[in-house]
């Protein structure tokens, strides 16, 4: 939305021959009539004033500021009314501005106003002349005027005070004054608007401004550039800083003024930064945090990286994770925590005090968790600091693998993830979790454009090479079932996977050309990067892995092979809780899940609990591991299963 005052559209001229004569008489009369002064209180809007649309409060306020600064530069045209009153036929906005100043006690009610008094029969002609010939200053004229005053040494604040504009508006117009002359000429000729100029002003180099302008004209329909195209050409390798969690974490001070592209015309005063530079700064800060934790907590090594260590993907061959020790609070901490919880529970509503109490309790638990790592554990392990879902992710107790322990880890992983029979899972839960799994795979695939493209090509080849080509061109059908998936998945529209999909959808929607749905040739202007992102996202949206059960047999998940290909792990997108998973299981299934995760002690404790308590118990103990139900994972290759059998035999 433009924030700059712009030229109003001129109405089509109408034939007003009788008015012409009146205007000639009026002009002659006004030239001969001397100005007189009348008290402001005696002036009212004339009933013969042809203007019916009220003046905007902003325009009246600006004029009032101008009158306050330089006085009333133009007289009012009035005619006599009964009772020593005068009707204002020409100058209604000036009258409104004067009344505003009087209401603010800036001028008295009897302040003398310069007027010219005309006969009542010419009042309508005067009003028509005033309103019919009114022409707001063109933006190009305003830019030139502001530039001339700035060259005289006046500051934006001084210019604004003098003319009744805000300093912010003056700054913005002076920013446009630095545009290349050819662009300002196009604005003066009404070939472009101030919105085009605002987008071009993102680029400081005038030569680059002209290049972008010409490129946008060539790609625009009929040679008319699109604002969106200009903005994309200027910032194609950059990301917006407004609302960007990475930029907020790194901080604006990390970048020099030359590295930040400030958008003076955005409502949130945002801007743009190079995406590569932002990621480099983020990685540098993550490494700094990791170094601080290593030194403060006594770990052997540390690492800062863009993504968390994944123990079931390619990282599995490099890293392994120590089981997190149970946090133990001291007696003083237990006492303090109970006190805080009592105060927290006594509060009826969320407030500043509750936030402070919650933060202190969270800090105490966090400190206890860190303290639980023994010096021996820290001596042979490291801490990894990464970026996940817009926040810093800290992984403690990470160990580097040696070649000798790879086989042991494979055995342990297979033992922990021994599959439960999918037939024992209720159909409603099967539908819920396979929907959740589908959304997660969609989000993971969306992030790997090369795999998405391969999947798309493979799917098309099944149709073309398997059953013959279609007679009509590009007869491709895609069904996006987010409505049913979010309805069935426990996380709904609040899940991490769906929110990531919607964020990418919003980003891509902003890149689509104007009128794209009506004309496929608009896509010819898109870069290969954008096209690849669109293909990747749309392919991901087509993924469908909801399982069914017929005649007592559960269908195999179609996601198994794809998950293996993209290195997918469900816990990257989903956290099992009582509400979304454990509460839907039978108590023996909860106990079995704890045993599968290697939490035999917790499983024994769950045996003594009621089902609801056991579900909460499982949620608590599963929150920091990577366990996923066996029937929600892709099956291991047969060779792995054979090796596991051999290992079991050797162990026996």
Curated annotation (Swiss-Prot):
Entry keyword tRNA processing: no
Region Disordered: start-end pairs: 1-21, 628-652
Keyword line: Plasmid
Biased composition (Basic and acidic residues): 1-13, 641-652
Pfam families, per the entry: ParBc
GO molecular function: DNA binding
Gene Ontology CC: chromosome
GO terms classed as biological process: chromosome segregation
CDD domains in the record: ParB_N_like
Family designation: Belongs to the ParB family.
Name the record gives this protein: Uncharacterized protein YubM
Gene name linked to the record: yubM
